[in-house]
C-alpha cells in the first residue's frame, strides 16, 4: 500500500490495538528523550556557582523543570543551592532521569506487544464482530484518571502532605527553595505569582475532573449530540485532543514569557519585562536608600546588595536579547560571569550625580547619555566630537565604584570613564570570562525564551491541525460526496453517479 507521507497514520484507522501500540511507543519516545536529555545536561552542568552561573545561564532545559517539582540533589554529591549532600536517595536528578529511561523501555516493550497482539477481544463489538471503541466511555475513564492525578498532585505533592512541595521564592528570586505550599482558596489564589494557587487550582480542577469523569461514565450522550459531534469517529478524538494540547501550549507560553509562580526566575532566568520596567534596579536603589537612612556609608550600603540581585539587573540576562538563530547558552554569548565589579556612580565637575540611560531591550547599539536626577542631559559620548557640548572631557565626568570588586576605586581618566559609562548602559557591571567557552560576545536567550518560542510556534501549528481534523470529521460526508440523509442503500454500481437517485441504472 503506497501511502503518501501525510497519510501514513491511516493505517491505525479501525485498528484499536495498533492505535494503542503507536501511542504507547510515542510515550516511550517522550519519556526516553526526557531521561536522556536530563543525563546529558547533568554531564555538562557545572553546579559550582549557583549565583553567577546558575542553570539558566548554562542553557539547562529539563533540570529547571525537575527542580521546580522538588528535586534538588545529585548523586554527584552536589545540591542545586550550592551545598553538598551525602545521601540524596532515589529522588535525585539522576534517579528521576533513570526512572524515565526505565519507563521508556517498558513502554517500548508494551508497544511491541500491542502491535503484535492487536486483535484483542476487548476491541471487538459483540453485535457486529468488527473492531470498535466505545469513545464516550473511554473519554469518561481518561477524564476520571486525569482528575485523580491532578487532585493527587495538588493535595499531596504540592502541599507536602506526601511529597516534597514545589520551588517557592521571593519576588526578587533570592531565597528560593523547595517547600510545602498551603492552598490559597481566596481571591489571592487567582494571582499567577501566588504559589498557593497552584495547590488550590489542582485540587479544584482534579475534583471537577473526577466528577465529570464519573458523569461521562454513567450518562450516555444523546443520539443527536452523538451524531452531530461525530462521537463515533476517532478523528473527533484527534481533533479535540489537539485542541486541548494547543490551548495548554498557548497558556504555558504566556506563563513562561510573562512570568508566574510556576516559572521562578532562579530556575528559568528573569523576564524581559523586569528589565523594561527597571524592576531589579528599583529594588536595589530601595535597599541602598534604606541603608543610607540607617546611617550606613554609600560604600557600606552598596556592599550589602546581594550579588545575585545585582546579576539579575544586567541586560545579558534578558531573554529577549538573544537572536532567533543564535544557538547555545547565555554563557556561550557574553561569557561566564566571574564577579560583580560594583556599582559605578558618575559625577560631573560640579558634583552632580549622573545616571547613564540604559539600553532598551530591542536596541543593539544605543547612544551613551548621562542625565541628572531631574532627567536633564549633562554628559554624553558624542558621535561628532567637533560639535560636542557635553562630552566626558568637556563636562569633567568622574566615576567611583561602590560595592563589588572595585569598591572605593575611582577614575577620572576620560577613556576609562567612557568605558564604564558604555558598560553601565547594560545594567550592573560584571567581569565576564569569555575564554573558557570561546564565547563570542553576542547575547543569547535563556531557556525561558526557547520554551516560549517553541510552545507558541507549536501551539499555532496545532491550532491549524485542530481546524483541519475538526473539519474533516464534521464534514466527512460532504468531502466523501455522500448525503448522510440518503435512504437508499448506496452500493457501487447502483447509480451511474454515486448517491444520485436520479441516475438509477435500469436492469436489462
From Swiss-Prot:
Subcellular localization, per the record?
Plastid, Chloroplast thylakoid membrane
Q: Which UniProt keywords apply?
A: Chlorophyll, Chloroplast, Chromophore, Membrane, Photosynthesis, Photosystem II, Plastid, Thylakoid, Transmembrane, Transmembrane helix
* Listed GO CC annotations: chloroplast thylakoid membrane; photosystem II
Q: How is the cofactor bound?
A: Binds multiple chlorophylls. PSII binds additional chlorophylls, carotenoids and specific lipids.
Membrane topology designation:
Multi-pass membrane protein
Q: What are the boundaries of the signal sequence?
A: none
Subunit record text = PSII is composed of 1 copy each of membrane proteins PsbA, PsbB, PsbC, PsbD, PsbE, PsbF, PsbH, PsbI, PsbJ, PsbK, PsbL, PsbM, PsbT, PsbX, PsbY, PsbZ, Psb30/Ycf12, at least 3 peripheral proteins of the oxygen-evolving complex and a large number of cofactors. It forms dimeric complexes.
Family the UniProt entry places it in: Belongs to the PsbB/PsbC family. PsbB subfamily.
- Identification of the protein by name: Photosystem II CP47 reaction center protein
Amino acid at each position: 500500500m503506497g501511502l503518501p507521507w501525510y497519510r501514513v497514520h491511516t493505517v491505525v484507522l479501525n485498528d484499536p490495538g495498533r492505535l494503542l501500540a503507536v501511542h504507547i511507543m510515542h510515550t516511550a519516545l517522550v519519556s526516553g528523550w526526557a531521561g536522556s536529555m536530563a543525563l546529558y545536561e547533568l554531564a555538562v552542568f557545572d553546579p559550582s556557582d549557583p549565583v553567577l552561573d546558575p542553570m539558566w545561564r548554562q542553557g539547562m532545559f529539563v533540570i529547571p523543570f525537575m527542580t521546580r517539582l522538588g528535586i534538588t540533589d545529585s548523586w554527584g554529591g552536589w545540591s542545586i543551592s550550592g551545598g553538598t549532600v551525602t545521601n540524596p536517595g532515589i529522588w535525585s536528578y539522576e534517579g528521576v532521569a533513570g526512572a524515565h529511561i526505565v519507563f521508556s523501555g517498558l513502554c517500548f516493550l508494551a508497544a511491541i506487544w500491542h502491535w503484535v497482539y492487536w486483535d484483542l477481544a476487548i476491541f471487538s463489538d459483540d453485535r457486529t464482530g468488527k473492531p470498535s471503541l466505545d469513545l464516550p466511555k473511554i473519554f469518561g475513564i481518561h477524564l476520571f484518571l486525569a482528575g485523580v492525578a491532578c487532585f493527587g498532585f495538588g493535595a499531596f505533592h504540592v502541599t507536602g502532605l506526601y511529597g516534597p512541595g514545589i520551588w517557592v521564592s521571593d519576588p526578587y528570586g533570592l531565597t528560593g527553595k523547595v517547600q510545602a505550599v498551603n492552598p490559597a482558596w481566596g481571591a489571592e489564589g487567582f494571582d499567577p505569582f501566588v504559589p498557593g494557587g497552584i495547590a488550590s487550582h489542582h485540587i479544584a480542577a482534579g475534583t471537577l475532573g473526577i466528577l465529570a469523569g464519573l458523569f461521562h461514565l454513567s450518562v450516555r450522550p444523546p443520539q443527536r449530540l452523538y451524531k452531530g459531534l461525530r462521537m463515533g469517529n476517532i478523528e473527533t478524538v484527534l481533533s479535540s485532543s489537539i485542541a486541548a494540547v494547543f490551548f495548554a501550549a498557548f497558556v504555558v507560553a504566556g506563563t513562561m514569557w510573562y512570568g508566574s509562580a510556576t516559572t521562578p526566575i532562579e530556575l528559568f532566568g528573569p523576564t524581559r519585562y523586569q528589565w523594561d520596567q527597571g524592576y531589579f534596579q528599583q529594588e536595589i536603589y530601595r535597599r541602598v536608600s534604606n541603608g543610607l537612612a540607617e546611617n550606613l556609608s554609600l560604600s557600606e550600603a552598596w556592599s550589602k546588595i546581594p550579588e545575585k540581585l545585582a546579576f539579575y539587573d544586567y541586560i545579558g540576562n534578558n531573554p529577549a536579547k538573544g537572536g532567533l538563530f543564535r544557538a547555545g547558552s547565555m554563557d556561550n554569548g557574553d561569557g561566564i560571569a566571574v564577579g560583580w565589579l560594583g556599582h559605578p556612580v558618575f559625577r560631573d565637575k560640579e558634583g552632580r550625580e549622573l545616571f547613564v540611560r540604559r539600553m532598551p531591550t530591542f536596541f543593539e547599539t544605543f547612544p551613551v547619555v548621562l542625565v541628572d536626577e531631574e532627567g536633564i542631559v549633562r554628559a554624553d559620548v558624542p558621535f561628532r566630537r567637533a560639535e560636542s557640548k557635553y562630552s566626558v572631557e568637556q563636562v569633567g565626568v568622574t566615576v567611583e565604584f561602590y560595592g563589588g570588586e572595585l569598591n572605593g576605586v575611582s577614575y577620572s581618566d576620560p577613556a576609562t570613564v567612557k568605558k564604564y559609562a558604555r558598560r553601565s548602559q547594560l545594567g550592573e557591571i560584571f567581569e565576564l570570562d569569555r575564554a573558557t567557552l570561546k564565547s563570542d560576545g553576542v547575547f543569547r536567550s535563556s531557556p525561558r525564551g526557547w520554551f516560549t518560542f517553541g510552545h507558541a510556534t507549536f501551539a499555532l501549528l496545532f491550532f491549524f491541525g485542530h481546524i483541519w481534523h475538526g473539519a474533516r470529521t464534521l464534514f466527512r460526508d460532504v468531502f466523501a460526496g455522500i448525503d448522510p440523509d440518503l435512504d437508499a442503500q448506496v452500493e457501487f454500481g447502483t447509480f451511474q453517479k454515486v448517491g444520485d437517485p436520479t441516475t438509477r441504472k435500469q436492469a436489462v
